[in-house]
Amino acid sequence: MTAPVYDYSDDVMDFDEVLEHFDPVMGMEVHVELATKTKMFSTSSAEFGDAPNSNVDPCSLGLPGALPVVNKLGVEWAIKIGLALNCEIAPKSRFARKNYFYPDQPKNYQISQYDEPIAYDGYLDVVLEDGTEWRVEIERAHMEEDTGKLTHLGGADGRIHGATASLVDCNRAGVPLIEIVTKPIEGAGERAPEVAKAYVSALRDLVKALGVSDARMDQGSMRVDSNLSLRPVGTTEYGTRTETKNINSLKSVEQAVRFEMQRQAACLVNDVEIVQETRHYQETDGTTSKGRPKETMADYRYFNDPDLPPVLAPAEWVEEIRATLPEMPWIRRARIQEEWGLKDEEMRDLVNAGALDLVVDTVEAGAKPDEARSWWVSYLAGKANEQGVELSGLDITPTQVARVASLVNEGKLTTKLARQAVDGVLAGEGDVDEVVAARGLEVVRDDGAIEAAVDEALAANPDIVEKYRAGNKKVTGAIVGAVMKATKGKADPAQVNQLIAKKLS
């Protein structure tokens, strides 16, 4: 009797219970869009965000007779990524046609690489939250072209199911991609979700450092597919895997792996068949939902593209590219940690929060390292959490944060007023100085007004005055609070404390 096919159920297994029975095996596939000016096989612009179907040409539309021409810079950047991932670079690689029908694929095949990728057998060492280092082995990194983009209309969740119409934008068709595929990641156990997140984070940092991609997961220039299967503890045979597609944030990577472990475990203990399929990650509740059956390699009918010659990468050219590699992110982190005098856990907090580059840019814009860290890791991290976005997705720049810090140092803003200024920038009210002026946030400089507020607060709190004069100097906080309330937070606390001490001496 055939086991029932499992789609989705809220009856997932408790995560700790999963680990008692099963070991997870993961595989990560990450697509990185290269930031070249033109497409991989034609001269059309690869600019993101242009009007739909404005960056198209006969080749990216798959018109009869159109012939592809390889973008040399795309090949160079593919080699650069391979070298940074400690891969072997193939002296000769080939493009192949991956055949499948989908409306966003005008040619009905995708130019990719199959059995002769440009880079293979590498690794990337990643650091987990507690400082543990984990080596993720790379199977291959290969070149291919991106597909177009579909916009589904009429459905409840923007997906094709339930849609009444679909719009095709071919601007993205032909944009150069590098797909980076890991070898099976085994032995991670309870840390599998964390390892997946750390790997994607490290890979994102790497390609950004290389200058080959902005790696914006929210815009699709870096897209993550996670493959996962479970096997009983103590066994070695792989289970049936599922592939969760197009995960678009680090948090979602972790949640998708965790949920799929719990879902598959519930299937296995209830004798429900796990189908090899693609699944969609649901941002709203952190679950995955059924997609389509997963094709095998044979289904794609790969064959060498007859319109494209082999890609040759002589050793001399590879070494020239190697010489252009920038400081790697892990080396840069060690240097910054030493220069700023940070403890290991302080540096990990910066990296785990996705704040390191933002803090570095804020320091370069004029802020002190401790000021920049404080803003990004505490207050702005809280704002990002409230909005459900990553730090880099906030509508404030490092230059603006540095300006806020400067105004605090100049005594023109208190910390409380500075936070209000930041809130205004995040709300789209303008640049820092515009928000300060529009909201009237600058610290009050009228000595007479502040002194009057101090006198009023002292008169209203004779018991505090008495305690102070009896030797308890810590009671002035209530007086300072009253003055700040009277001045709507615009008085300089240091000036207020000086006035209080002077009047009570």
Curated annotation (Swiss-Prot):
EC class: ligase
Signal peptide: none
Alphabetical GO biological process terms: glutaminyl-tRNAGln biosynthesis via transamidation; translation
Record's keyword terms, sorted: ATP-binding, Ligase, Nucleotide-binding, Protein biosynthesis
Gene3D superfamilies noted in UniProt: 1.10.10.410
Domain of life according to the entry: Bacteria
Pfam families referenced in this protein's UniProt entry, alphabetically: GatB_N, GatB_Yqey
Reactions the enzyme catalyzes: L-glutamyl-tRNA(Gln) + L-glutamine + ATP + H2O = L-glutaminyl-tRNA(Gln) + L-glutamate + ADP + phosphate + H(+); L-aspartyl-tRNA(Asn) + L-glutamine + ATP + H2O = L-asparaginyl-tRNA(Asn) + L-glutamate + ADP + phosphate + 2 H(+)
Cited SUPFAM superfamilies: GatB/YqeY motif, Glutamine synthetase/guanido kinase
EC number: 6.3.5.-
Gene Ontology MF, one: glutaminyl-tRNA synthase (glutamine-hydrolyzing) activity
Family: Belongs to the GatB/GatE family. GatB subfamily.
Quaternary structure, from the entry: Heterotrimer of A, B and C subunits.
Role noted for this protein: Allows the formation of correctly charged Asn-tRNA(Asn) or Gln-tRNA(Gln) through the transamidation of misacylated Asp-tRNA(Asn) or Glu-tRNA(Gln) in organisms which lack either or both of asparaginyl-tRNA or glutaminyl-tRNA synthetases. The reaction takes place in the presence of glutamine and ATP through an activated phospho-Asp-tRNA(Asn) or phospho-Glu-tRNA(Gln).
Protein name from the UniProt record: Aspartyl/glutamyl-tRNA(Asn/Gln) amidotransferase subunit B
Species this protein is from: Corynebacterium jeikeium (strain K411)
